[in-house]
Structures are given as C-alpha cells and as structure tokens.
Amino acid sequence: MGTASDAAALVTRLVRVRGRVQGIGYREACVRRARALGVTGWVRNRMDASVEAMLQGLPLQLEAMCAWLDEGMPAALVEGMEVIEVPAPFPRFDRFEQLPTL
C-alpha cells in the first residue's frame, strides 16, 4: 500500500468469529493469512471463546480476509461471524499481530 489513493481507500473492520475457533491454532493461521494478503491490524481470543480481529486494508484484501475468517482452517468450526465497519478516522496499523486474550 504505497500510493496516496491506496491510503485513501483503506477500510477498517472489526470482526468477531464464534464457534470452535480457540485452542486449534486459528489465531496463528489468521496472522499468516493476513500477512499473505497484505492486511494489517490484530487478532486476539476473547474470554467468551470467540476470536476478535481488527482488519485494515483495501476493500478486496478485506473481502478475501473475511472470507477466510468465515471458513477458517480445517480444524475450525465457524458458527457465526459479525463484521462492523469502523468509520474514519481510524488508527493506521503497520503490521498484523496477535494480541493477548481479552
């Protein structure tokens, strides 16, 4: 994402994934997928057994990332996903990382 038009097109979404998504390497796989797609932000487990992710990137990048989150990895069983668009202005992320459980 190097051009001014790319920066202007940035989208940020907060995603909550429910189902069997903890204790199976879902967050680690999420970090790998996000980095491969060029998505920045973070992912963390929640105490309610869900996984929460803040995603930032171009619309097509976030569509691909949300599709992956909804399907998950082979060991996951995604039962539901909530996506919230974060209105601008929003903080800029420079990488994708795994955060501690909240």
Curated annotation (Swiss-Prot):
Quote one Gene Ontology molecular function term: acylphosphatase activity
Ranges for domain Acylphosphatase-like come to 12-100
The answer on whether this UniProt entry bears the keyword Hydrolase reads: yes
**UniProt catalytic activity:** an acyl phosphate + H2O = a carboxylate + phosphate + H(+)
What's the protein here called? Answer: Acylphosphatase 1
Indicate the residues that form the catalytic site: 27, 45
Keyword annotations from UniProtKB, A to Z = Hydrolase
For whether the record's keyword set contains Metal-binding, the answer is no
Q: What is the lineage of its organism?
A: Bacteria, Pseudomonadati, Pseudomonadota, Betaproteobacteria, Burkholderiales
* InterPro entries linked: Acylphosphatase, Acylphosphatase-like_dom, Acylphosphatase-like_dom_sf
Q: Which Pfam families match?
A: Acylphosphatase
What the record says about family reads:
Belongs to the acylphosphatase family.
Which top EC class is given? hydrolase
This enzyme's EC code(s): 3.6.1.7
